[in-house]
From Swiss-Prot:
Residue ranges with Basic residues bias: 18-27
EC number: 2.1.1.354
Pfam families with a match to the protein in the record: N-SET, SET, SET_assoc
Compositional bias (Basic and acidic residues): 71-84, 120-129, 710-721
Identification of the protein by name: Histone-lysine N-methyltransferase, H3 lysine-4 specific
Amino acid sequence: MSYNNRSGGGASGGYSRRGYHGSHRGGYRTGRSKYPEDRYLVGGMLSLNKGSHYESSDNRYIPNEIGSKSPENRSHRSSTKDGRTPSGLSTPLSSSDKVSTPISIESINGSDRNTGVNNKDSEFPKLSHHSDFTSTIPFSRSINPQKNFMVINDSHTPKTDKGIQSKKIRYNGEGVNHVSDPRIAQSNSNLQKPTKKTKKTPYKQLPQPKFVYNSDSLGPAPMSTIIIWDLPISTSEPFLRNFVSRYGNPLEEMTFITDPTTAVPLGIVTFKFQGNPQKASELAKNFIKTVRQDELKIDGATLKIALNDNENQLLNRKLESAKKKMLQQRLQREQEEEKRRQKLVEEQKKQELLKKKEKEHQESVKKEKSVEHESTIVSTRDKNLVYKPNSTVLSMRHNHKIISSVILPKDLEKYIKSRPYILIRDKYVPTKKISSHDIKRALKKYDWTRVLSDKSGFFIVFNSLNECERCFLNEDNKKFFEYKLVMEMAIPEGFTNNIRENESKSTNDVLDEATNILIKEFQTFLAKDIRERIIAPNILDLLAHDKYPELVEELKSREQAAKPKVLVTNNQLKENALSILEKQRQLFQQRLPSFRMSHDRTQQHKPKRRNSIIPMQHALNFDDDEDSESHSQSESEDEDEDETTASRPLTPVVSTMKRERSSTITSIEDDIELEEREIKKQKVKVPAIEAEIAPESSPEEGEEEEKEEVEIKQEAEEVDIKFQPTEESPRTVYPEIPFSGDFDLNALQHTIKDSEDLLLAQEVLSETTPSGLSNIEYWSWKSKNRKDVQEISQEEEYIEELPESLQSTTGSFKSEGVRKIPEIEKIGYLPHRKRTNKPIKTIQYEDEDEEKPNENTNAVQSSRVNRANNRRFAADITAQIGSESDVLSLNALTKRKKPVTFARSAIHNWGLYAMEPIAAKEMIIEYVGERIRQQVAEHREKSYLKTGIGSSYLFRIDDNTVIDATKKGGIARFINHCCSPSCTAKIIKVEGKKRIVIYALRDIEANEELTYDYKFERETNDEERIRCLCGAPGCKGYLN
């Protein structure tokens, strides 16, 4: 809006409202006046008539003469803070604030410069916003041309003056000074020297403006990210972070860049300081400046550092260069490795050629020897059976058929080394379910050397063919857990069975061991003699006192000077007197006849005689009797131990387990060896006095005893081993073959072992009439082939008939639909559920009398060791359970638990098993779970049933507390129910809290399943009763 005075037309002294044009930058466009000389522009915002002013008398607007100078106008200040009128426009500024200057306006083509009227405006249609409607709008009040202003507020007058509110405020601009720039006065004062009145220092120049980057700023942010490249690979992130932060500025982020494919560090790091972008940029520049000035180094390498641009161009260049370096280094390594490989390949080829030549030479030598040696091996059990190298004897199912081939993986050739072995295939005893330790435990009564496990099966390796054949004949087709040990005995190609050679080797080995022991003893005695008889006298001669008389005198004088003067006291005199009396008493006892018991008693209470002090150089010439005796005893014991340990691999310890055939010779020899060892130990423990009293045996008696032993051995060797008497109950020479139904030709050949059997068969068949067969050999061959054709395959032999309840009535189970099989019926056909009338343990034996190993295997231990073990066991039991209170510490509870594990159970799902033997009344494990209230337990039990989670593991402590181990618990929750359990549960207090602990009721073997009686209440509804599957002899049939 602009105020215009139109003297030419309309109401004189009035004002007209006209529209304004323009934007914020151009300001408001002033209204056009017909009188160009009466127009005065102020700041391009408001137009007033040039030369006009207000009079204070009548408030009239009177224009001055044309061409006169504009007076010094002064306007009243608006009540608003920015000096605007209520209409929104700025009021005229006073001359003291700003000097108004006219603005030049360029004329538009066709328009009058003075009037601003264009003749061509009539050609265009006039729009509504271009027309002036002020003359048509009626005024809301009467127009007073004398008063064309309104004062709202005057900031110069104080507000405390109450009388000024009634006065009329009017300001005509009296006493106005000339216009001056206030900045010049301020700059002059700052540029001059400081006066005494102020302490302000002058500015050397005007302060420069600073532009802080924020979220509203345009353009890129200042660079604040620092890049370090070519760093050593050994530098870590904490080290570099500490190195940078010690300059006083904390870091915001630091990233180590690695190769995305290989994850190898590229030696490039980017980091940034904390703070706003402006501050971070300044800190980064200062840090780069200090690094370049001081030439800082890390691990001997100078830091290469620079600021990263906003587009990451520098970072990308450094990444590309680092990747190129990595590729070059990798190529160099590959080239070097290829060179090394080529060298290794060449060396290997040379070695292979040499090895081939050596092998060819050895094979040629072996072939020459094998031609001379017999290629057949006669069985030690049956002389009719002849084994050849590179042959396999099949199981009893195939009537011990011999095949001319051996199954031996290449990986196991270096372990077997052409020794006989027994193969148990994986389809009969799976290697994934049964470990080699179980096989070792089952065959521990045989002298095997190794048990190897492979994907094809188990390989039991033997050193002797006799032991391998004995194990094969005794253990073939025996039951092992729920499987059968179907064995195949294999004899490799390079095996030679020379019994005499083996015996000679064993005797030679014994002789070699004896000679080695003797040589070691001779060496020790020789070293002792050299030390005592040669070295010691020469050293004593060199250190003789005669050669150093001056030193001896000096030492004596020093010793005498150093000795303090001894003052004899009354106590010392008493002790001396007592010592004299004691010596007399001892002399009197020595004169009496020495009895053995009295001598022993006095010897026990006799004080030890103090050895005389001898210089070190003379001590080598003397031997202490007591030391020699103790040394001899310890040496003899060590020798006995060495003999036993040395002879262990050659002569194994006699096992107390039962065997099918045990010879009297081996048992007698073993007894003699045990008696000799006991006599040796007794001789060692006898004191020296008893050894002197004991009569020595004459050499003639010893020779007679040796002759008798030799004669006994010769007589025993003449008798065949098979027909010698046994120490156990009488049994057959050959193992009995079970009757398999049809007695065919194979069974007849297998039963007739020797000439005696043949004579008995002839007597039995003497009354039968001979058949009229022309060719018996052809008939026997045909009958054997017919038997092989009719034989059922090995897989079908394991298929058993299902019970009637599980048989299909329609002929196909698919047509019957889905039905739930009860747990009791699953026992009939599931392998891990076959537990009918079996004890609850994992290691089971088919025949308790024959197969179960002797439980008295520890009988070889001395009685002293057994008594000590029993005392220790009783002390542990009394310490744990007998005198145990219900209050324990948490450490004691955790330390006393036994090692247990969980596995598939034959009772139900998972079960808890002991990993080592556990004695009765010992603590086993704590029942761990979430401790909840009774109401929560009832709610959870219902929710578990709804969700179909199956088993819930809730164990009640008391009426208010329940342990829930369903989702938060230990492995103790897997313990199954049994009507005759092996464990029980006790509730004890640990650090003020009740806990459930499981104890052993009886002795538990290793790998035995732990069971517990759930003690559920009897259910009245028979449909809700749960079937018990423990299989114990006294099973109740139901859990509840």
